[in-house]
Amino acid sequence: RGDIFTLPAKSGITYNLTNSSNANDRNPQWSPDGKWIAYISDKNGEFNIWLRDAFTGEEKMLTKDLKTYIFDLKWAPDSRSILWSEKKNTLNLTQVSDGKTEVIASSGVGPINSFNWSQDSRYITYIQPGKEMDNIIIYDRNSKEKHQMTDGWYNVSSPNFSKDGKYLVFVSARTFNPTYSSTEWNHVYNNMNKIYILPLTQDATIPFAPENDNPKAPQQTPPTRETKKSEATKEHPKNEYDYTNIANRIIELPVSAGNYHDLHMIGNQVYFNRYGNTSIYNLKDRKETDLNSRIMFGPGYEKAIAQSGRAFQVIDIPSAPVSVNHPISTSDLKKYIDYHQEWMQIYNESWRQMRDFFYAKNMHGVDWQGVYEKYKVLIPHVNHRTDLTYVIGEMIGELSVGHAYSANGEHPTPARIPMGLLGARFKKDPSGYFKVTKIIEGANWNEATRSPLTMPGVEVKEGHYILAINGKSLKETENLFSELIGKAGKTVELTVNTRPETAGARQVLVTPLSDESQLYYYNWVQNNIRKVSEATNGEVGYIHIPDMGVDGLNEFVKHYYPQLGKKALIIDDRGNGGGNVSPMITERLMRTPHFYTMHTNQTSGSVSPVGTFLGPKVLLVNEYSASDGDLFPYRFKFNKLGTVIGHRTWGGVVGYSGTIPVVDGGSIVTPSYAPFAADGSGFIIEGHGVDPDILLENDPYLEFNGEDQQLNKAIEVILEKLKTEKKEVPAIPEFPVK
């Protein structure tokens, strides 16, 4: 909530060190020598790194006038400097003594957010972002030289030095084990990451090297002055790294491929995080152990914190599974909030986030400082979080860009009543009972699209009557749904009959839905499929794509492959909520036959590549075809795949990659990337949309009454195309004589 606390490991007092509502204080870290606490704060109006004396409480601002978003910081093990990264895509080193800062690395691709120190504070390793593949770099502070550890052929992440500094451990995507699709002859690569070890010094033991048990004469190596000094002062040994032929020394840890991060190496043990918990791989025993908790290591690997759920406990460095039996007490982690101060801080940070993350440096020509002043005067009058969200929304709206949103943080959320729904429409009959006037068609094999009244054993039909719910007669009930309050997902008994009378009635058990939207959507799509099929004598297929996410991809796959045998195709992008899968869909629609294949006793050939649709295509769009639903018709037109019909699309394609929360859990969406034309002529689509080839708006009255003029036009156009653009698999040629 924007404050820095210290907690006793066992017993004592919890201290709120910053105790403010007008600043976002975050990312605190003790210095390894325990003298300082470094943290990031915007208490002076911009995010900077602050130092707090752990004993006196005195504070000083270490960095000055950054005007950027700081992602993270890490102390050098000698407590003399701090490494930190920020949104201008630089990795920086700041001296604690005087605040002097040097840029260690920069990137024209993205932030440098994965970095670590060697325990002697001499070396820094980090990920250098690349357009295709990232690389691991080691920076030597003594020589000021950078050394690339990887060859750019495989993606890498999470580099870290071993405790003794002789090894580098990292994650890399080098496991090639394709999974083949069940819908077409295609593949995907999942779970490519494994853990790798790179010996850095000439005297480093090579893990998993061949061994020989024959005894050897012991070698007496007299201790050097450096060794004696290290033993006497417990300093870390001074390592000199050998960079020759470095990429060929990489060794794979024999663990299964998966999602790994947060690597550490202490002696023969490699610690890694996978699926939430930390595990150990013992290089000597060649065994993997799940520690049953998430482990976070303290400075110098002297202590660690084990986390299980929301419980934390200080422990020694573990080598066996950990149980959090004596968690740190967090009961005193409390603060008093001045909401008006907090709302001003949230307003300020929201303005800065848009400044720091917005894709266009010119802020679309808007006087962004002037916009800040314009809306700032309203904040003292805000008395509810929803009002703040509205003001921030108006502020960022000055940029005239899509994907610029403001989301509520802490605000009242009334509990919703789980109303039971039956996938049907009803009318009060003169008898007092309820007549079923419409049953929404469903796919009962799918929980999301089941229609309760049509389930096996229920089989209520249109024109039937609902007489009672759970034994209570509906004769005096004004609204049938008043008896279904709180019944969603629960078993309900309906008394039904073909006539509005109790004689001959039967009781059936149903499970009402909590949401009918998927049922209505399924029904709408099926009606469109039938309409297109009936109007084209079964020759034309129909696909609706509701978004460009998982649901949209599923709808495309479900309806594209079964209709490959159709002679033409209508694709409906109307109401598409966006996402990111339009390249996958477009690639399939772009396929053209390279050749045809026949098998023994086949009467016709098959298209190669598989999944190729031969016939003409038409695309429907409207003003609700948004985001990637905008980009899809652009790709469709760019590749000349067919005619686009309907209304100009939404026109919002400046996208975003995640959000950064503000102190109360709210966020703003900052548009951070934008598409521009293939010929480099300028940015595309944003603020205008994609124009259809045939402009046609649905009349709202006709649409409400079931007439879809745009779909009717698509049918008309596709039938005309079939007269001139019809494509079919050619007949199998005569067999050769050899």
Q: Model-derived features: where do they sit?
A:
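Hydrophobic beta-strand positions that form the internal "hydrophobic ladder"
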Residues: 37, 79-82, 121-124, 168, ...
